[in-house]
């Protein structure tokens, strides 16, 4: 890391080492090393799962946080094409890039599908030329549903070391991208440490740092300050940027009757600027210049929903959908400049209004990937908003949303800590995987089937290893059955040895196999035997107690 980017409090250590029951493995595909988490099952089989943790779970890797991760993509081809060197431009030219081949191997699909979806604008590959450390991923509805984890300091909480650890911790448990939303001290330095050590794409909201440069006064913001901030972040390697260019002056009055007004930080900043100057947003008026900047680095637009609803009462209102129509216009402009685009969505939406959001986004924004914050399906559960939002997230992902921004238990209450980050990631991995199952994504059900088989065969350690959170699964089992023999017992503390339905089912199968019967025949034979026994006893319901 360049000395100019160093600070007096370096990051000394982060969480490393394999996840329980697994090892880091690399599959050689078409000259590329594709990372997977290989689970070694007790029956001698192995099971590979998609892995976002980078070298941090590789016990053979040497982690040097000062130097950063190996520059994986430095040696990859960057073909010459007319216009910008972006994944969108290459895809439109019919070129399958190394990033596309890498992604295809990770997803278990053909490289041509990756290229075609990127070319059509239905998928994006956030991969800044200046972030060679990342392992490429794709965001699009024909691929695995991705999740993002927000990290970042505030004016009152957290350090650089804590934020880097949050990044490593989030990717360990499955975060596909990270957003650094720092608003406190050392924003540039924090971002530099995260980028140089992040194996996944990193997103930002540049208006936050721009606001810091003018001491927190929205009215003092200028296009020049914002432009320079975007260039600064693009030079560092930021892969996608949230830009609230759809918050127009004429839309601000539409929020006046809302229960919760404008809840987006970026949206409120731009609304305040528009009202202070009574002029159209500089993000909107300078959008084409912004496109030219992002195209140089292949930074992906994440067009922000600055007027998203902050309560279920405000869901699907005119302010929200007016902004969405403008985002559709901006999507066309960005793509004409060869810049990849995804669209951000709500927010707080009751279940019966969720699918309408996806339908309109696809209609108005040319099916650009949808990236939503939840949405929260109800407003009544502070401290449990990871659950209220996961309900909405599963529904909206099944309907076609490509990436879900996680919500932690601290939502609306405070800055999430390390434990909150893990809870948010695991909760959203559940929602994303449930949607993958419902959409029939290739290979999605294989992990469910493997875990169900292990459960039926009482392979407890395999159940833990195949789960999204092996540590917690094992800890819960250990609370009541910590002894080593319990890890092969044919029951758990829920039902005990006599009432375990799976043990009884297994006994039926064993009886059937021993007597050359089908399961149904075995049950019928057992019932017949009991019937004969009842008749032999004289048909008595109550028999004498045998001491």
Swiss-Prot record:
Gene3D superfamilies: 6.10.250.620, Radical SAM ThiC family, central domain (3.20.20.540). Keywords: 4Fe-4S, Iron, Iron-sulfur, Lyase, Metal-binding, S-adenosyl-L-methionine, Thiamine biosynthesis, Zinc. This is Phosphomethylpyrimidine synthase. One of its GO terms (molecular function) is 4 iron, 4 sulfur cluster binding. The keyword Lipid biosynthesis does not apply. Pfam families: ThiC-associated, ThiC_Rad_SAM. The gene is thiC. Its EC number is 4.1.99.17. Its cofactor is [4Fe-4S] cluster. It catalyses: 5-amino-1-(5-phospho-beta-D-ribosyl)imidazole + S-adenosyl-L-methionine = 4-amino-2-methyl-5-(phosphooxymethyl)pyrimidine + CO + 5'-deoxyadenosine + formate + L-methionine + 3 H(+). Belongs to the ThiC family. Substrate binds at residues 150, 179, 208, 244, 264-266, 305-308, 344, 371.
């Amino acid at each position: 890391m360049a000395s100019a980017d160093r600070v007096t409090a370096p990051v000394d250590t982060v969480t490393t080492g394999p996840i329980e029951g697994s090892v880091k493995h690399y599959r050689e595909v078409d000259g590329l090393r594709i990372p997977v988490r290989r689970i070694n099952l007790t029956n001698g089989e192995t099971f590979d799962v998609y892995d976002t943790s980078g070298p941090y779970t590789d016990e053979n890797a040497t982690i040097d946080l000062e130097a950063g991760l190996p520059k994986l993509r430095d040696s990859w081809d960057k073909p010459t094409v007319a216009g910008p060197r972006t994944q969108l431009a290459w895809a439109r030219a019919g070129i399958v890039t190394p990033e596309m081949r890498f992604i295809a191997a990770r997803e278990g699909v053909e490289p041509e599908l990756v290229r075609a979806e990127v070319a059509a604008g239905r998928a994006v590959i956030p991969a800044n030329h200046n972030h060679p450390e990342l392992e490429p991923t794709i965001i699009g509805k024909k691929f695995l549903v991705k999740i993002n984890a927000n990290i970042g300091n505030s004016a009152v909480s957290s350090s650089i070391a804590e934020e880097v650890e949050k990044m490593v911790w989030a990717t360990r448990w499955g975060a596909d991208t990270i957003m650094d939303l720092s608003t406190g001290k050392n924003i540039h330095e924090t971002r530099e440490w995260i980028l140089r050590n992040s194996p996944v794409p990193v997103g930002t909201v540049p208006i936050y740092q721009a606001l810091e440069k003018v001491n927190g006064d929205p009215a003092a913001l200028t296009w020049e300050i914002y432009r320079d901030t975007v260039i600064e972040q693009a030079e560092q390697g930021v892969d996608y940027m949230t830009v609230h260019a759809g918050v127009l002056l004429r839309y601000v009055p539409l929020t006046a009757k809302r229960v919760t007004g404008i809840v987006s930080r970026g949206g409120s900043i731009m609304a305040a600027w528009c009202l202070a100057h009574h002029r159209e947003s500089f993000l909107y008026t300078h959008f084409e210049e912004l496109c030219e900047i992002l195209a140089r680095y292949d930074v992906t637009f994440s067009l922000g929903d600055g007027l998203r609803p902050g309560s279920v009462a405000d869901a699907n209102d005119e302010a929200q959908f007016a902004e969405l129509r403008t985002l559709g216009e901006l999507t066309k402009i960005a793509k004409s400049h060869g810049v990849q685009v995804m669209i951000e969505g709500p927010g707080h939406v009751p279940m019966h209004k969720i699918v309408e959001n996806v339908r309109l986004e696809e209609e108005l924004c040319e099916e650009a990937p949808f990236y939503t914050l939840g949405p929260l399906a109800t407003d009544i559960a502070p401290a449990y908003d990871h659950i209220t939002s996961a309900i909405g997230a599963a529904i909206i992902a099944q309907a076609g949303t490509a990436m879900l921004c996680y919500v932690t238990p601290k939502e609306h209450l405070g800055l999430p800590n390390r434990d909150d980050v893990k809870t948010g990631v695991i909760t959203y991995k559940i929602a994303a995987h449930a949607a993958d199952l419902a959409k029939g994504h290739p290979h999605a059900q294989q992990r469910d089937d493997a875990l169900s088989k292990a459960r039926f065969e009482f392979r407890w350690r395999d159940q833990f290893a195949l789960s999204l959170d092996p540590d917690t699964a094992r800890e819960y089992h250990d609370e009541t059955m910590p002894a080593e023999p319990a890890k092969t017992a044919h029951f758990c503390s829920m039902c005990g040895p006599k009432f375990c339905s799976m043990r009884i089912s297994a006994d039926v199968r064993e009886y059937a196999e021993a007597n050359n019967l089908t399961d149904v025949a075995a049950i019928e034979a057992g019932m017949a035997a009991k019937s004969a026994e009842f008749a032999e006893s004289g048909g008595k319901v109550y028999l004498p107690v045998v001491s």
